[in-house]
């Protein structure tokens, strides 16, 4: 939008607590049960505590993002002064999750100036299962780090919509294929040298990291890696072994989808009635997800599915409701009513027998 600055990361005004985040994850999982919900955290002191809360909020994947951030939309102050090495944030996150018995139910991804197979091996030993590459991949495609991504003036045509500048782009998909092929080959060679068959076998194995011998520089001997390489000795998993239980198998939408099958499949007009309680969260999200997957953003014809509710609806009532779906609630609704409304209609009315007038 002209005149509106692009700042990364943007503020999220619907998330002020772990409970808010848990509700967002629940909403998104309802819309697309097959999606892996990822939460990105900046590597910093104390990130382990936040990561534990994110794991309890049922995120499927936690990203620990280190270094200064590669996006050209970052404020200069953030690029210069924010962010620490990903090793520090990853190590703290791994130790905290294992200590609290949460590590087995989440995937850990790390990014931040990863460039070589050695970087991948070290990050895996510190606890990561997935690895993000951004800056190095952009450079492979021709990026010259002008940091003009948000100004539409990229001189090599990597990040711009300007047709003349885009003509300067010389990147090819083969370059990326070669880069990651060589990267994987280097990882394979390191694994063979260590004596393991799979990358999974070294995840969380900080005991395999050996400090370099004395190089004669006295200052190096003052650095202690004990905290960074500490390994929590308990019976908890040290890598992802099981999926999160999101509790979406018994939401109100499962019942609605069964009753509204004719409307969803054949666009037949149907009216339904239900009682609803404040434990029924994200009502309509899964229904909308199924309709959107089948018909796209156009949804259903107008007034195809009309659902009337009575009671006190839980959070995110009518979230992401698509065209052709009408919700009428006689009662009250909680936070995030009509969140992300996508063309559907929601009417909330006081109960018929209420005694108040305002």
Language-model features: where?
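Gly-rich Lys/Arg/Thr-decorated short loops/hinges at beta-loop-alpha junctions or inter-strand turns
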Residues: 1-12, 29-34, 68-81, 103, ...
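Catalytic cores of alpha/beta
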Residues: 46-56, 115-127
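Flexible glycine/proline-rich, aromatic-decorated loop/lid segments
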Residues: 59-70, 80-93, 125-165
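Terminal amphipathic helices with adjacent charged low-complexity linkers/tails
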Residues: 61, 65-70, 196-249, 330-333, ...
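Active-site or pore-adjacent capping/gating segments
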Residues: 131, 139-206, 210
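Feature marks extracellular polysaccharide-active and adherence modules
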Residues: 290, 310, 320, 328-332, ...
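The right-handed parallel beta-helix/beta-solenoid scaffold, focusing on the short coil/turn
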Residues: 303-305, 317, 323-325, 337, ...
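Conserved small/polar residues in nucleotide/adenosyl-binding loops
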Residues: 357-358
């Amino acid at each position: 939008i002209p005149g509106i600055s692009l700042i990364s990361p943007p503020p999220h005004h619907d998330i002020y607590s772990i409970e808010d985040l848990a509700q967002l994850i629940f909403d998104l999982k309802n819309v697309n049960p097959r999606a892996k919900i990822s939460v990105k955290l900046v590597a910093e002191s104390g990130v382990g505590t936040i990561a534990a809360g994110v794991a309890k909020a049922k995120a499927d994947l936690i990203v620990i993002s280190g270094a200064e951030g590669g996006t050209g939309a970052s404020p200069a102050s953030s690029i210069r002064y924010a962010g620490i090495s990903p090793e520090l944030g990853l190590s703290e996150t791994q130790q905290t999750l294992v200590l609290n018995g949460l590590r087995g139910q989440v995937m850990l991804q790390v990014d931040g100036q990863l460039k070589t197979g050695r970087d991948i091996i070290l990050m895996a030993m510190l606890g990561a299962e997935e690895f993000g590459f951004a800056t190095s991949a952009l450079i492979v495609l021709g990026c010259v780090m002008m940091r003009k991504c948000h100004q539409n003036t990229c001189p090599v045509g990597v990040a711009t919509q300007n047709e003349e500048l885009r003509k300067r782009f010389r990147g090819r998909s083969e370059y990326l294929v070669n880069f990651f092929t060589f990267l994987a080959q280097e990882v394979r060679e390191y694994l063979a040298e260590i004596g393991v068959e799979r990358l999974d076998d070294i995840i969380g194995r900080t005991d395999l990291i050996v400090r370099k011998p004395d190089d004669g520089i006295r200052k190096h001997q003052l650095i202690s890696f004990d905290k960074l390489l500490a390994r929590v000795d308990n019976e908890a998993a040290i890598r992802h072994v099981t999926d999160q239980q999101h509790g979406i198998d018994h939401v109100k939408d499962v019942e609605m989808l069964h009753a509204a099958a004719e409307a969803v499949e054949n666009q037949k007009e149907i009216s339904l009635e239900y009682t609803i309680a404040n434990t029924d969260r994200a009502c309509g999200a899964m229904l909308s997800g199924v309709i959107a997957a089948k018909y796209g953003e156009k949804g259903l014809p107008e007034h195809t599915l009309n659902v009337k509710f009575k009671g006190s609806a839980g959070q995110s009532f009518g979230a992401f409701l698509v065209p052709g779906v009408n919700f009428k609630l006689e009662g009250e609704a909680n936070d995030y009513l009509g969140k992300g409304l996508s063309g559907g209609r929601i009417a909330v009315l006081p109960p018929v027998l209420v005694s108040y007038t305002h």
